[in-house]
Amino acid sequence: MMKIIAMLFVVFSGTLATANAQTTVSDADKAAITQTALDYLEGWYAADGERMEKALHPELAKRIVRTNAEGQSRLDQMGAMTLVQYTRRGGGKNTPRDKQQKDVTILDVFGNTASVKAVAADWIDYLHVAKSNGKWVIVNVLWEMKPKKE
């Protein structure tokens, strides 16, 4: 009986150590994830298409659920190149520098994936970030406009 208990203890301890090793995130990865989100936000405000593009996976899907006056919802989406083109057009430059909110919070990281909350002046983004070819890039964005201030 003691052998079984000892063996279970060893197996359980090894499982915990493996799980812990997989969930440990390096400071370098945390910094790279944060920088990716900042490239996205700051690239928008600066109308810097190259910086925006650097932050995005080429197959990015950016989505928002919009609800019309009748209460019917639809899903609108754009891809990476559309977002880069909007960035280059300079829409972000309409936000005064002192109003440019750029709050980044890493919500979770596991292996080569991360979830990040990015708060901008007019909207909140939930980013899915992945390490692709050694570089952290945004793969998915689900976003919502902030209510208009009166």
Model-identified regions with their sequence ranges:
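Positively charged n-region of N-terminal signal peptides that target proteins for export
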Residues: M1-I5, Q22
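Bacterial N-terminal signal peptides
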Residues: A6-T15
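Compositionally biased, proline/threonine/alanine/serine-rich low-complexity intrinsically disordered stretches
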Residues: V10, Q22-T24, E150
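Short, low-complexity N-terminal intrinsically disordered segments enriched in polar/charged residues
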Residues: A19-E50, K54, P58
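N-terminal, post-signal-peptide region of Sec/Tat-exported proteins
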Residues: Y45-Q85
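Surface-exposed, charged secondary-structure patches
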Residues: V65-R66, R74-W123
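Short beta-strand edge/turn micro-motifs at domain boundaries
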Residues: S115, I124-K149
